[in-house]
Amino acid sequence: MAFPIPARQLFIDGEWREPIKKNRIPVINPSTEEIIGDIPAATAEDVEVAVVAARRAFRRNNWSATSGAHRATYLRAIAAKITEKKDHFVKLETIDSGKPFDEAVLDIDDVASCFEYFAGQAEALDGKQKAPVTLPMERFKSHVLRQPLGVVGLISPWNYPLLMATWKIAPALAAGCTAVLKPSELASVTCLEFGEVCNEVGLPPGVLNILTGLGPDAGAPLVSHPDVDKIAFTGSSATGSKVMASAAQLVKPVTLELGGKSPIVVFEDVDIDKVVEWTIFGCFWTNGQICSATSRLLVHESIAAEFVDKLVKWTKNIKISDPFEEGCRLGPVISKGQYDKIMKFISTAKSEGATILYGGSRPEHLKKGYYIEPTIVTDISTSMQIWKEEVFGPVLCVKTFSSEDEAIALANDTEYGLAAAVFSNDLERCERITKALEVGAVWVNCSQPCFVQAPWGGIKRSGFGRELGEWGIQNYLNIKQVTQDISDEPWGWYKSP
């Protein structure tokens, strides 16, 4: 489907500005491999201009020093404007990222919902200011202020381009911070378009600045900038480590939402067809490009044969097509680089002795685009690369277990700790498994539902900190203790001269 990509510049201080070095990055439609436009390529010089604008906006009295209720009016206006322009954003997200149109619809709905939710959090912040602290000495009284951290750098990924940027923008702005957003260069179009929304609702200049560009050229200078007070990053564990190391030089706080290799544990007492659908959804949703993808299937040995047989039948029924086609449930992966990486994972699995039970190739009916069949890999050992490393593509590996203890051990056999799913009709067993799983989120009898009201984040090498919910806004607040002596009496520690 042909759809024009708007020609945009960098969004700095409420204006569209050409990059200082005037470079551009081509936008490639992953469904066709065709160049459909370009985006500006920011460098360290542009980062400097954007950070100065954000700091100036933070020091003005029309944002950070205002009430949460005042900021909430802007967040609600943004939510309304996103809803008004929903069709435009959905089309751009689909053509830029390759995700199925129906998924992009849900994403953009969630963008609006996220701004609406954090508008409420901004208002709630007003009621929490000057919260009293009970002290053991009557001559003192104490309270707590919740104040914005300052200028924050937000680095977002390409799998949910505008939505995961929103997970950072909305709470940061609700808290009263000003921000510089650096989205992934692989899918930046909707994030740039968001700058136009900011202007349309009258967001004060400099409150949000949007820089597209390559990680080393724009992301790294943002992380290391001495006038950026915090970094919130979503991306790979390897890049997250670099972000953390760079920020550490300035003792700069970071929140990191990184990779995963999440397990899905299926016990013998389940409705197999129901769980099979959740299994393919948990791994193949968003074209398999989900940090929380439950890509390690652990199924009880007593039902494994029947389960895997139905798994293949359901997987064969997935419609793989141009993302704009009605009923599309699997589109292309994001780029040629990602395509090659996934195919290398599959070939390595074969060479290590695994069986590609289904898929593993380009769909025969799609000659162009970065399409990969949904792939099921069996005969897995825990030493294999496919078991240990994040693929970030539509690849599911399958292993059996015989006992609850074995299931827990296999599920936790990973350096990651983002999410996990457990399926059983025995809810007491589900509760035991939930407590034992070393992750930040557990789905019981489902996989992947995510709500703005609930916290999101991982442990181990999946990062730290929590986005969304009431925890999301806390990432962007400084908690300040204020203690006052209310006695007329002298302190009396030293002898009076």
From Swiss-Prot:
Gene field: BADH
Binding positions (NAD(+)): S156, P157, W158, K182, P183, S184, E185, S236, S237, A238, T239, L258, E390, W456
Source superkingdom: Eukaryota
Induction: Induced by salt stress.
InterPro entries: Ald_DH/histidinol_DH, Ald_DH_C, Ald_DH_CS_CYS, Ald_DH_CS_GLU, Ald_DH_N, Aldehyde_DH_dom, Aldehyde_DH_NAD(P)
Record-linked Pfam families: Aldedh
BP-aspect Gene Ontology terms: aldehyde metabolic process; cellular detoxification of aldehyde; glycine betaine biosynthetic process from choline
Consequence the record notes for mutating A441I: Decreases binding affinity for betaine aldehyde; increases binding affinity for 4-aminobutanal
EC number: 1.2.1.-, 1.2.1.47, 1.2.1.19, 1.2.1.8
Post-translational modification Blocked amino end (Arg), affected residues: R8
Pathways involved: Amine and polyamine biosynthesis; betaine biosynthesis via choline pathway; betaine from betaine aldehyde: step 1/1
Lineage: Eukaryota, Viridiplantae, Streptophyta, Embryophyta, Tracheophyta
Gene3D superfamilies the record matches: Aldehyde Dehydrogenase, Chain A, domain 1, Aldehyde Dehydrogenase, Chain A, domain 2
Protein name: Aminoaldehyde dehydrogenase BADH
Protein family according to the UniProt entry: Belongs to the aldehyde dehydrogenase family.
UniProt site (Transition state stabilizer): N159
CDD domains xref list: ALDH_F10_BADH
Role noted for this protein: Dehydrogenase innvolved in glycine betaine biosynthesis. Metabolizes and detoxifies aldehyde products of polyamine degradation to non-toxic amino acids. Catalyzes the oxidation of betaine aldehyde to glycine betaine. Catalyzes the oxidation of 4-aminobutanal and 3-aminopropanal to 4-aminobutanoate and beta-alanine, respectively.
Transmembrane segments: none
Keyword Metal-binding: yes
UniProt keyword Chloroplast present: no
Record: residues binding K(+) 2: V251, K460
Mutation effect (W285A): Decreases binding affinity for betaine aldehyde
Activity regulation (record text): Is reversibly and partially inactivated by betaine aldehyde in the absence of NAD(+) in a time- and concentration-dependent mode.
